[in-house]
Amino acid sequence: MPACRLCLLATGLLLGLLLFTPLSATGTRAEKPGVCPQLEPITDCVKACILDNDCQDNYKCCQAGCGSVCSKPNGLSEGKLSRTATGTTTLSAGLARTSPLSRGQVSTKPPVVTKEGGNGEKQGTCPSVDFPKLGLCEDQCQMDSQCSGNMKCCRNGCGKMGCTTPKF
């Protein structure tokens, strides 16, 4: 009888794995192309989306602190917020920014980005990274111009890119 109990246990574990495997493995939760811009935190932690598929067209579901919004990937042009028919808040482009006095309202005016030379690369060099580095293991940028202020787009220690304070 112990062998039957092991069979039942193994069957139960396999069934549990199948039930709790993320849908992305089946292709129904495919991530949209592009990289989310670096967004400043939304103060009221509203999650306007959970997955890229919650956003229309080529918009991605991007983290903004404890909240999330649908955002045009890699955009730095001034954008605007709009609501979809399903009530999803969409950020057309730019960086979502709030201030403690704004009561959760979101500004989408981009930061001033000064380009050094004609290629958009900012001054300074990327710092060396100690492996493994703790933090977000996801792409936050693809080029310096997507980072605010004098921050540069550099490797973050897990094979991804993030906005980092450069060395001068």
Swiss-Prot record:
Residue intervals of the WAP domain: 31-74, 119-167
Q: Secretion signal: which residues?
A: 1-30
Q: Is Lyase given among the entry's keywords?
A: no
- Extract one GO BP annotation from the record: antibacterial humoral response
| Gene3D superfamilies according to UniProt | Elafin-like
| GO CC annotation | extracellular space
Location in the cell? Secreted
One matching Pfam family is WAP
Which terms in the Gene Ontology molecular function aspect does this entry carry?
aspartic-type endopeptidase inhibitor activity; cysteine-type endopeptidase inhibitor activity; serine-type endopeptidase inhibitor activity
UniProt-listed InterPro entries:
Elafin-like_sf, WAP_dom, WAP_four-disulfide_core
**Coiled-coil annotated spans:** none
Broad class of the protein's primary localization: secreted
Q: Which UniProt keywords apply?
A: Aspartic protease inhibitor, Disulfide bond, Protease inhibitor, Repeat, Secreted, Serine protease inhibitor, Signal, Thiol protease inhibitor
Q: Where is this region: Disordered?
A: 100-123
Per the UniProt entry, the disulfide pairs are 36-62, 45-66, 49-61, 55-70, 126-154, 137-158, 141-153, 147-163
Q: What does this protein do?
A: Broad range protease inhibitor.
Known partners and oligomeric status: Homotrimer; disulfide-linked.
State the name under which the record lists this protein.
WAP four-disulfide core domain protein 2
User: To which species is this protein native?
Assistant: Rattus norvegicus (Rat)
The protein's gene is named Wfdc2
